[in-house]
């Protein structure tokens, strides 16, 4: 069986609220760590989210 190209990742808020999004990424085309600016409802503003592993 072939290895899956898409993997699940966790995008953790840099505002230190503990809020996170779970999304997928293609591990072949996106080899570096993903960062996105998204809304953090606990901080009530848009902040940067950085990729971490799902445990």
UniProtKB/Swiss-Prot annotation:
Molecular-function GO term, any one: structural constituent of ribosome
Cystine connections: none
Hydrolase in keyword set: no
Keyword annotations of the record: Ribonucleoprotein, Ribosomal protein
Family annotation (Pfam families): Ribosomal_L33
SUPFAM superfamilies: Zn-binding ribosomal proteins (SSF57829)
Record-given protein name: Large ribosomal subunit protein bL33
Organism: Rhizobium etli (strain ATCC 51251 / DSM 11541 / JCM 21823 / NBRC 15573 / CFN 42)
Lineage of source species: Bacteria, Pseudomonadati, Pseudomonadota, Alphaproteobacteria, Hyphomicrobiales
Gene name of the record: rpmG
